Amino acid sequence: MLSHRLTLTVSLTLCYTPLAWTEDTPQAQLSNLLRRVNTMSATVQQLIVESDGAVLEESSIQMHVMKPDGFYWETLEPFPELVVTNGAVLWNYQPDLEQVVIENWDSSRAELAAELLSGRTDSLAEEYEIHIEKDIGEDMAVFQLLPLDQNSLYRRINISFDNTALLSIHLDSKNGQKTLWQFNQPQINQQLPPDLFNFQIPTGIDIVDNRVSQD
């Protein structure tokens, strides 16, 4: 399945009207920012920092999202890897290993990223205490999610919007590790080919098929 870092990234999106603070709950405001987007493409810069401040990893990523469950996350540098799902099957392709791992995709078991990707944010209030910072600028919004589960890997999750655009996601782990995703050059509601989310397996590579029959 997706790594913990990957399952808590990605799929936040944009809306088409400027931010306007209302009496809505933070959960409702976050949902409003997500619900109007059907597709999103962006380049993502990933930075992972250890508890002592040392940089563990810097990555360049290409991301495509298509509701309800299309997800494409390709790490370009430093180590090529592709994770893609069409909502039924998940492929994890590692070209350096000449291997693809295939699994069932079950959005009901997915973590935060899949909920946000599909716009299913209703359960967020059951899993997180959601706050919003309103004092950082007229066109800025930062949502802070505090896990209610004491066994969560994360201390907090910050989701930042700049006016109508998703700016970044910041994960603060309990072990002191911090992960930052910076979203650049977003393209919203542009047509994406459905085949983008169906991985075509190259010839000559190893196939590890972990799918379980749904019958």
PLM features per residue range, with description:
Residues 1-8:
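Bacterial N-terminal signal peptides that target proteins for export
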Residues 16-17:
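N-terminal signal peptide c-region/cleavage motif recognized by signal peptidases
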Residues 44, 71-75, 90-93, 145, ...:
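Short hydrophobic/aromatic-rich beta-strand segments that constitute the beta-sheet cores
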Residues 20-24:
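Boundary at the C-terminal end of the N-terminal hydrophobic targeting segment
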Residues 109-125:
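Short, solvent-exposed helix-to-loop capping segments enriched in aromatics
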Residues 62-112, 179-180:
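An acidic-aromatic
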Residues 101, 125-130, 134-211:
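Gly/Pro-enriched, hydrophobic low-complexity segments
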Residues 25, 29, 34-87:
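N-terminal mature ectodomain segment of secretory-pathway/periplasmic proteins
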